[in-house]
Every structure is written in structure tokens, then in C-alpha cells.
């Protein structure tokens, strides 16, 4: 009887919790996992603010110490952002699978692995053919670099199987550049990349040969044009940035692109500034190290 009373009491107390409190707790848990319990600028005393603007909807979140407060409960996001920042995530794929993290609260790397494998297990040949037919231009360019697919053996090992062969290679033994294309292709084929969805790419060009950088830039632009995918991209490469500009113009997407540059506001804060009307500012900043090197060379001569 005591246990039943405790159970009923727990239900009664749970029903008293507001939807707002539940939402704020969920947001706090997710953000704390992603940012390792450091949501605020450790060098500033100001409370933190997060603002998200999607079409005509706005979400405002205030962060004070570990307390989260969101301004609304009905923010209409129906697609999931896919964050790709490290192709080496495939090297630890078996370890992360065995950790079995909670599906509700995963960091972006665990989330990516789940999308790569668990979604892939439920992808039929018909599903892949539909994607191939619908996005022939994108798929054809992917095939030029990455003609195989990622498979999971009965032993649990994750491997890459090239086209027209029964043999496979451990994903750990793939070149780092190829891993980047394998990840993108797998997410496209298994339906993880949705129409009007979002992909966040953090310096994707780092491990790519210059020729592959061009192909990757073209793929990103085509995904946005053919699939309606929103792409948030960070790069420190003027070469890769120029490739994005050129292919955006080629596929008539230049007016859809926005360019931003980060700069220090003071010793403790940085600002992100829209320079879409003057992209040369970015190239000037990225070219400064090369100018330093040229000055050194001149001094040697």
C-alpha cells in the first residue's frame, strides 16, 4: 500500500510540472551534453542568449549559470540538423556503438553514427534506387569519388564495399578524404538528409585533395539546389571558399548564399558579421598569413 501511495504521489507531483519547465530541462540537458557543461563564456560575466530565427518564427533562450529559459514551446522545427565535423568518427564507430548512449541525449558524433548505421540498416534497395533516380546529378558526382557503400558485417565490423566486388575494407583503413564522401553518400542514400533539412559542416576541406575540394564544393551547392538543403559551412580556406562562390554562380544559387566573418570585438568576445556584400574582406583576412610568408621570403632573398 505504501509503494502504491508513493507511486500515486509521484504521478500527482509530475502532473504539477509545467510544459515550460520540462522543455527548459530538456534543452539544458541537450546543450550541456554537447558543450560539456560549459554553455556560457567562461571569460565573461554576462548571461548567455541564444536566438534562432527560422522564416517567420523566433526562438529566444536565456542561459544563466546552468539555468535555461526558453520563450516559447511551439517552435516549429520538423527537420533535424546533421553536424559533420570529423571524418575520423568512423575510426571509433565500433567503440561508440558499444557505449549505447541514450537516444534522447547524444552529442553530435553519437547522433551521426546512429544516423549512419541504424538508419542504414532499414534502407532497402528500392529506397536507394529512388534516391539515385531522383538525384542523378548529385549521385553521379558522388559515384565518381565514392562508388561503394558502407556495410555492417555479422561480426559487427563496419566496412566499405566498393562497387562490383564482394570484398570490403575496414572503414578505419579508408583515406580521410574518402571517409568524408562516404559519410555524405550514406546519409543521402538512407534518407537522413531531408528536403529542406540542414547540414552543418566544420572545415570539410581540411583532409581533401584540392581536386576533391572542388568536387565536394560542387556537391554542397547541388544539395542545396536540388534538395533544398540548408548548409551552414565554416572554412579557413580561400581556395574552398572560391569554389563555393564559383559553383553557386554556375548553378544560379549565388543569390541564396550568405557570407559571414568572425572578428574579435574585445579580449573576451567575438562577433559574427554579415559580409555578403563584400566577400573580399574574407579573402583579405585569409590571405594575410600568405603575405607574411611572402615577406619572409623577400627578407631571405
Regions found by a protein language model. Name each.
Residues 165, 172, 207, 231-232:
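Short N-terminal micro-motifs specific to bacterial/archaeal maturation
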Residues 198-200:
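Walker B motif beta-strand of ABC-family P-loop ATPases
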Residues 215-301:
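C-terminal lobe/lid and adjacent interdomain/linker elements of RecA-like ASCE P-loop ATPase modules
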Residues 209-210, 214:
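Conserved D-loop-proximal element of ABC-family nucleotide-binding domains
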Residues 4, 206-208:
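Intrinsically disordered, low-complexity segments enriched in glycine/proline and serine/threonine
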Residues 2-196, 270-301:
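Phosphate-coordinating catalytic segments in nucleotide- and nucleic-acid-processing enzymes
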Residues 202-204:
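Walker B catalytic acidic pair
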